[in-house]
């Protein structure tokens, strides 16, 4: 390929990493056994290739710059990154990674950590300047990725907010600053394990030291003797430069004209401001983006990259501003969030296109292929469980009989409990289902009553909030067949309808009604009553038309033979003693159209199935009155830490995982967190409906349909203690002697958060500023509820460092207790004022149904 280095030819075809080291103007491929070993005197290019479930390959290009790298190598790396982008069809996202300031995405490729090696790598693979020391000291930060920096072996390198690892000849010490989080301490243990296995061949002692703990601890004495004895650690100093960058709300947009930056004057950023024949720089403080139009030349892109580096250098922000390079059509979520409106991408439906190509190949080879079987859905629950359905009515519930539990009304709300046995354990899956026309009073009651019903069962319970029209496949699997009628039976809904004198469309046994029939093959079938009009038809589906005592079964021209079989089965359910008239699309009799109120236009395009979405994991927490979410890249089971609440985002549904020590005490609190997450708009296509399905999974109760997203180790599921204690027990090979934590969601049947209608929000972000800043966002209503830290805790008169908002342990406010062990306090997601009321509810007698 012209203008592309030969080293890039044929790369990116397989998932994984490809790494090259810059040697002058040449690229030296790094073998896989050496991946993760970076030298401070070199610059590297890293290609990450991931195959999405849609079959599309996603490419991310990073060029890593060591702190001692040559300037000419940095320029070569940026040019080669452009060449690699061209070789891959100009659909990559490029990141400039500076040693010590790497992105979480980059660090996630090299778990447990990367520890840059002093010196450089020559073209003959000889190491220069590799310094071997008897004792080395590392500073560790980060909760889901470890940021490891070698620091001088000195007492002055210690502080209260980080975790430090001191590696000696015979023992590895881990020192936890009193303001470090429990997650950071646990992640630092991964670094300790890495050093033990790679530098000591697995043979060395491990000692953990707590900041301020001296009395009766021989390991602490040995640790401080390394520094010549104990001395107080100075108070932490806040990084004012980074704070200013993070708090600034101003954004600057420039278009690049022959390496000159021309400001674009605007108050709000809109997608229409970006022209395809230009390149732009968007400065957002902590991140600086280069957006390249799809019609720009390669030479223009190289000039723009140079302009970007000049801009960051002139601003003096090489070390604290991350550069991201994008091509039009391949923008990241972080970039889109800075714009007021960003249109939804028109993505080719490769999933269905591939199926059609396979069918064409078989037909060409002489096979009679009328239909390629669809992929059978993956079922992770037993289909032999027991089902119970309750109607929510006037603040209470009524158990439906077996004959009625497969008939729901769209004006009502229901609680569904599906109980089944899995791996010898009892599981209970609760759904709070809200009909499309149900009223807010019943919706709120359904969520509250379901929360109280959890206490009535033994075993593992998972709850879900589901809305009509957005049900997951899991919901329909628990029903053998399901019919959803128009109308309602609850008193609140009937009163609402009577006040409006609007009962048109309610299902009448001998009336006229139209049902759309769908189903999961061989598993379940459903019929949903739709508006009685020809416009409700769709060529991709089959329908049952009830016209008094007569029935029509209508076959859409794009429906499949399996759809026709489902239609016959539903006729036996809906009207078992009636004969129906089979009608194919295009040959309808006049009385068919008369029953529908006349002919009209309807959708005749094939409904294309979206490919399965790739899941993304986010950690959520409150910080200084703000609710924030941050993506966890290359996630695993170990990222489900007990002190946190995490959201597994599968686009069509959310799985809200609640750790025992997260501080979330009720189902309603967890649901509110899910609503805030949906309102933030961090998904690729922006904000999603508030009625997206949300599962609440409590630590220890994980069902198989959740664990299937992980390489699950069930022995870890039963471990006790905080995340640091659990990982330390594994590392030392000792058995735990800890009490079983109380499962808070089983104890609370109400929430102290204000309840909202599922279709409304008390505070929805509408500006880019509210949606931006590294996937962090705020909820104004929740911010008012959060109580800020006491000014006394931040008093400058105190010599001990004050706990950070993310601290799990705090130093005493008394100078006399400087040398005492700081008490470990689990960070609570919600502030104490909210917990007090939630705990008061938890101590009351649970509602029995």
Swiss-Prot record:
Residue ranges of Gelsolin-like repeats: 30-107, 147-213, 262-335, 405-475, 527-566
Annotated disulfide bonds: none
InterPro entries, per database record: ADF-H/Gelsolin-like_dom_sf, Gelsolin-like_dom, Villin/Gelsolin
Pfam families: Gelsolin
Keywords (A to Z) from UniProt: Actin capping, Actin-binding, Calcium, Cytoplasm, Cytoskeleton, Repeat
Highest taxon in the source lineage: Eukaryota
Record's compositionally biased regions (Low complexity): 747-782, 791-823
Function noted in UniProt: Ca(2+)-independent actin-binding protein. Binds actin microfilaments (MFs). Involved in actin filament bundling, severing and capping. Caps the barbed end of actin filaments and protects them from disassembly. Promotes VLN3-mediated MF severing.
Protein name stated in the entry: Villin-1
Organism: Oryza sativa subsp. indica
């Amino acid at each position: 390929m012209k203008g592309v280095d030969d080293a890039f030819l044929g790369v990116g075809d397989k998932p994984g990493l490809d790494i090259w080291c810059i040697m002058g103007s040449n690229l030296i491929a790094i073998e896989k056994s050496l991946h993760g070993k970076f030298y401070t005197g070199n610059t590297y290019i890293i290609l990450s290739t991931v195959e999405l479930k849609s079959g599309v390959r996603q490419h991310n290009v990073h060029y890593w710059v060591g702190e001692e790298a040559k300037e000419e190598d940095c320029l070569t790396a940026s040019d080669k990154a452009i060449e690699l982008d061209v070789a891959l069809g100009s659909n990559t996202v490029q990141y400039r990674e500076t040693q010590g300031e790497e992105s979480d995405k980059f660090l996630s490729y090299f778990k447990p950590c990367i520890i840059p090696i002093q010196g450089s790598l020559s073209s003959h693979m000889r190491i220069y300047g590799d310094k071997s020391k008897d004792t080395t000291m590392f500073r560790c930060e980060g909760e889901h990725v470890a940021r490891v920096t070698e620091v001088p072996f000195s007492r002055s390198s210690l502080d209260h907010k980080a975790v430090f690892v001191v590696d000696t000849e015979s023992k590895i010490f881990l020192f936890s600053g009193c303001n470090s989080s429990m997650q950071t301490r646990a992640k630092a243990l991964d670094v300790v394990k890495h050093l033990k296995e790679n530098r000591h061949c697995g043979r060395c002692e491990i000692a953990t030291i707590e900041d301020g703990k001296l009395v009766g601890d021989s390991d602490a004495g040995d640790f401080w003797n390394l520094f010549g004895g104990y001395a107080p650690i100075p108070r932490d100093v806040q990084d004012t430069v980074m704070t200013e960058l993070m708090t600034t709300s101003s954004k600057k947009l420039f278009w690049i004209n022959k390496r000159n930056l021309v400001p674009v004057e605007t108050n709000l950023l809109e997608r229409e401001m970006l022209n395809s024949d230009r390149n732009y720089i968007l400065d957002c403080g902590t991140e600086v983006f280069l957006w390249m139009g799809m019609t720009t030349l390669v030479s223009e892109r190289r000039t723009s990259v140079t302009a970007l580096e000049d801009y960051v250098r002139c601003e003096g922000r090489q070390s604290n501003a991350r550069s991201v390079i994008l091509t039009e059509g391949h923008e990241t979520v972080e970039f889109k969030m800075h714009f007021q409106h960003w249109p939804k991408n028109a993505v080719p439906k490769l999933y269905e296109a591939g199926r059609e190509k396979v069918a064409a190949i078989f037909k060409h080879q002489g096979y009679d292929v009328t239909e390629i079987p669809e992929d059978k859905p993956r079922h992770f629950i037993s289909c032999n469980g027991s089902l119970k359905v309750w109607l929510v009515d006037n603040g209470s519930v009524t158990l439906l009989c077996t004959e009625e539990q497969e008939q729901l009304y769209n004006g009502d709300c229901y609680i569904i409990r599906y109980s089944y046995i899995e791996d010898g354990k009892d599981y209970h899956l609760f759904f709070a289902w809200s009909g499309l026309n149900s009223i807010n009073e019943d919706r709120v009651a359904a969520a509250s009553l379901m929360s109280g019903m959890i206490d009535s069962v033994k075993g593992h319970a998972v709850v879900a909030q589901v809305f009509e029209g957005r049900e997951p496949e899991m919901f329909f699997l628990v029903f053998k067949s399901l019919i959803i009628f128009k109308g309602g039976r609850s008193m609140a809904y009937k009163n609402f309808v009577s006040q409006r004198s609007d009962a048109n469309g309610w299902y009448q046994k001998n009336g006229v009604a139209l049902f759309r029939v769908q189903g999961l093959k061989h598993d379940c079938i459903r019929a949903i009553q739709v508006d009685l009009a020809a416009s409700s038809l769709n060529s991709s589906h089959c329908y049952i038309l009830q016209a008094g005592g007569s029935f029509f079964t209508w076959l859409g021209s794009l429906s499949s033979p399996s759809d026709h079989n489902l239609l016959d089965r539903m006729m036996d359910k809906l009207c078992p003693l009636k004969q129906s008239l089979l009608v194919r699309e295009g040959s309808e009799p006049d009385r068919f159209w008369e029953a529908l109120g006349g002919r009209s236009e309807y959708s005749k395009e094939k409904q294309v199935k979206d490919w399965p979405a790739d899941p993304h994991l986010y950690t959520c927490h409150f910080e200084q009155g703000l609710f924030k979410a941050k993506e966890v890249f290359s996630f695993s089971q170990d990222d489900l830490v007990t002190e946190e609440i995490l959201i597994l985002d599968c686009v069509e549904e959310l799985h809200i995982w609640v750790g025992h020590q997260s501080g979330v005490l009720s189902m309603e609190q967890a649901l509110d967190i899910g609503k805030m997450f949906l309102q933030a708009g961090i998904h690729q296509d922006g904000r999603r409906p508030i009625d997206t399905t949300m599962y609440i999974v409590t630590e220890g109760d994980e069902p198989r349909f959740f664990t299937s997203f992980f390489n699950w180790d069930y022995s870890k599921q039963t471990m006790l203690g905080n995340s640091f204690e659990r990982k330390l027990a594994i590392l030392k090979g000792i058995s735990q002697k800890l009490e079983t934590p109380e499962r808070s969601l089983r104890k609370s049947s109400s929430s102290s958060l204000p309840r909202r209608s599922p279709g409304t929000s008390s505070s929805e972000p509408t500006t880019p500023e509210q949606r931006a800043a590294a996937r962090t966002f705020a909820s104004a209503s929740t911010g008012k509820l959060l109580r800020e830290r006491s000014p006394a805790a931040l008093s400058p008169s105190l010599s001990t460092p004050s706990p950070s908002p993310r601290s799990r342990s705090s130093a005493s406010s008394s100078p006399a207790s400087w040398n005492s062990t700081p008490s470990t306090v689990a960070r609570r997601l919600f502030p104490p004022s909210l917990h007090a009321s939630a705990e008061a509810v938890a101590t009351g007698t649970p509602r029995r149904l």
